[in-house]
UniProtKB/Swiss-Prot annotation:
Name of the protein in its database record: Probable AP endonuclease
Note: Consistent with its intracellular location, ASFV encodes its own replicative DNA polymerase and three base excision repair enzymes: a class II AP endonuclease, the repair polymerase Pol X, and an ATP-dependent DNA ligase.
UniProt cross-references to SUPFAM superfamilies, sorted A to Z: Xylose isomerase-like
Disulfide partners: 16-20
Binding site for Zn(2+) 1: 78, 271
Presence of the UniProt keyword Methyltransferase in the record: no
Primary localization class, coarse: host cell
Knockout consequences: Decreases the growth rate of the virus to 2-4% of the parental virus in swine macrophages.
Gene3D superfamilies: Divalent-metal-dependent TIM barrel enzymes
Enzyme class: hydrolase
Summary of the function given for this chain in its UniProt record: Endonuclease of the viral base excision repair system that catalyzes DNA cleavage reaction at the apurinic or apyrimidinic sites (AP sites). Cleaves phosphodiester bonds on the 5' side of AP sites. In addition to endonuclease activity, the AP endonuclease has a proofreading 3'-5' exonuclease activity that is considerably more efficient in the elimination of a mismatch than in that of a correctly paired base. Displays 3'-phosphatase and 3'-repair diesterase activities. The single nucleotide gaps generated by the AP endonuclease are filled by the viral repair DNA polymerase X and the DNA ligase.
Length: 296
């Protein structure tokens, strides 16, 4: 279930004006076939990302659904950076998130990723209660990156506390998006196979609270030190999490994450947004070649 973030800025043909998301996905699928790694998943923006504006056009909706069905792709949308239903602007935000969820349903997108805030679990649950569930579309709460806040949602205790509240409130269609760069930035050491294994075993111990069917991953290395609180992604084995394991990859924490992802069939997205299409494809070719070797 491995794939990547598909930015239409970097993936669509020049001059594309109406079906740019579909065009981007078509080019992305062709690229996966070219490098010998057929993609099973993808992540897109259908709105924003920095403004509350829907940016998928009607023609694009029709063609995107056809593309997703044709290639049997699991696609998730990332919410805008304003999608914070536990904020002071919650009424407007909730309405906008509802629009995004309905569009996801319409075009065959399976989920919407929202950034978790560094706030108490009860505030998050109250915000989620304002959103009407849309059948077949999961809201994935993404682990945040922070250094000083009490609630980082990078430890299993805090993740369990949050999802117990979600379950006890009978909220439906809520999942977890684990960003490896974010939990590292928040102080969780996942560099070695043993370190990552300890964290992932703790995750497996709470599958009764948050099942793997509702877990996805953002599989990123990080350009900053553990506990920095800074969100800066790097290519796999090029950042500070796993670079020291580039010549012993099966002893790395990344290999442990790959094992968990394949064992439980979780979607995993590489989030890269480099300066040019050529830079991006060069980086992804190296990363997916490495992943292919880990999947043997």
């Amino acid at each position: 279930m491995f794939g990547a973030f598909v930015s239409h800025r970097l993936w669509s043909d020049s001059g594309c004006t109406t079906t740019c998301i579909t065009n981007s996905i078509a080019n992305y699928v062709a690229f996966g076939e070219q490098i010998g790694f057929p993609f099973k998943s993808a992540q897109v923006f259908i709105a924003g990302p920095r403004k509350a504006v829907i940016n998928i056009q009607e023609d694009d909706k029709v063609e995107l659904l056809k593309m997703i069905v044709k290639h049997n792709l699991w696609v998730v949308a990332h919410g805008t950076y304003l999608d914070v239903p536990w904020s002071r602007r919650s009424a407007f935000v909730t309405h906008f998130i509802q629009q995004e969820l309905l569009i996801c349903k319409e075009v065959g997108i399976k989920g919407l990723v929202l950034h978790l805030g560094a706030v108490e679990p009860e505030l998050i649950v109250e915000g989620l209660k304002k959103i009407k569930p849309v059948e077949g579309v999961v809201i994935y709460l993404e682990t945040p990156h922070n250094k000083h806040h009490t609630y980082k949602y990078s430890t299993m205790e805090q993740i369990k506390e949050l999802f117990l509240r979600i379950r006890n409130t009978r909220l439906k269609q809520i999942g977890l998006c684990i960003d490896t760069a974010h939990i590292w930035s928040s102080g969780v050491n996942i560099s070695s196979y043993n370190d990552a294994g300890q964290w992932l075993r703790s995750l497996e111990n709470i599958h009764s609270v948050i099942p793997p069917s509702h877990i996805m991953f953002h599989l990123n290395d990080a350009a900053t030190e553990c506990g920095s609180g800074i969100d800066r992604h790097a290519s796999l084995f090029e950042g500070m999490i796993w670079k020291s394991y580039s010549h012993k990859i099966k002893k790395s924490g990344l290999y442990c994450f790959v094992e968990y992802i394949t064992r439980h069939q979780c979607p995993a997205i590489l989030e890269r947004n480099l300066g040019s299409s050529m830079q991006l494809q060069t980086a992804l070719t190296a990363e997916f070649t490495t992943l292919k070797s880990l999947l043997k």
